[in-house]
Design a protein with these regions (language model features):
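Short beta-edge/loop segments at beta->alpha junctions of small alpha/beta modules
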Residues: 1-48
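Amphipathic alpha-helical interface surfaces
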Residues: 3, 58-59, 109
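Short gly/ser-rich loop at a beta-strand->alpha-helix junction or flexible surface loop bordering the NTP-binding
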Residues: 20-23, 51-90
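Positively charged, aromatic-accented nucleic-acid-binding surfaces
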Residues: 44-47, 58-61, 120-126
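Generic structural signal for hydrophobic core residues of well-folded globular domains
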Residues: 46, 50, 66, 116-120
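A short, charged helix-loop
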Residues: 88-90, 94-98
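Hydrophobic alpha-helical interaction segments
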Residues: 99-173
Length: 173
């Protein structure tokens, strides 16, 4: 109770800000106002446990980083191995995408490519054709070993994702 009181007092003073139950951050001041923490920090407990990845940011936030869209979103999608109910984290709404493959640091970039193909129609502010071209550009930059791994990971995805990946790989040679 004493710790809770102290934290509540610091939040009231404005020294720290609360993200979620038991999660706080110290806001940085700039000439443009208060900076919020990076998205990965807001959901860090959902992405890592004991230094091992248990989830990864996917959806619009990740697709913007990959250059597939220019939209910035307040909805975070996290790929995890088990189903979880959607939740709110500060001003973000967090939803979960069940990922049948093992989540490792090496797999995450490949899983993002497959998720982009899976969620092709849901990527905002861009056409599916542009997305396919963007994903093809990402796939073209992969090494031979990564291409084999990508094909293995695709086995657990829907048939249309495997078909689209096959068509892209065919077009790349």
């Amino acid at each position: 109770p004493a710790l809770v009181k102290a934290l509540s007092r610091l939040v009231a003073e404005g020294s720290i800000c609360k993200i979620a139950k038991g999660r706080y951050y110290k806001p940085k001041q700039t000439v443009f106002g208060t900076l919020k923490p990076p998205v990965a920090e807001v959901v860090k407990d959902l992405l890592e446990r004991n230094g091992k990845p248990i989830g990864y940011i996917t959806g619009t936030a990740a697709f913007a980083q990959l250059g597939l869209t220019t939209q910035i979103t307040s909805a975070i999608t996290i790929g995890t191995n088990k189903y979880r109910r959607p939740m709110k984290r500060g001003e973000y709404s967090v939803s979960f995408l069940v990922q049948p493959n093992a989540i490792t640091r090496e797999n995450i970039p490949l899983l993002l490519i497959l998720d982009a193909l899976k969620l092709l129609r849901e990527i905002p502010a861009t056409s599916p054709d542009d997305c396919v071209r963007g994903v093809a550009r990402l796939i073209a930059a992969l090494s031979e070993g990564d291409l084999e791994k990508l094909a293995d990971l695709a086995e657990n995805y829907q048939p249309y994702v495997r078909a689209l990946l096959g068509a892209i790989l065919d077009s790349l040679g």
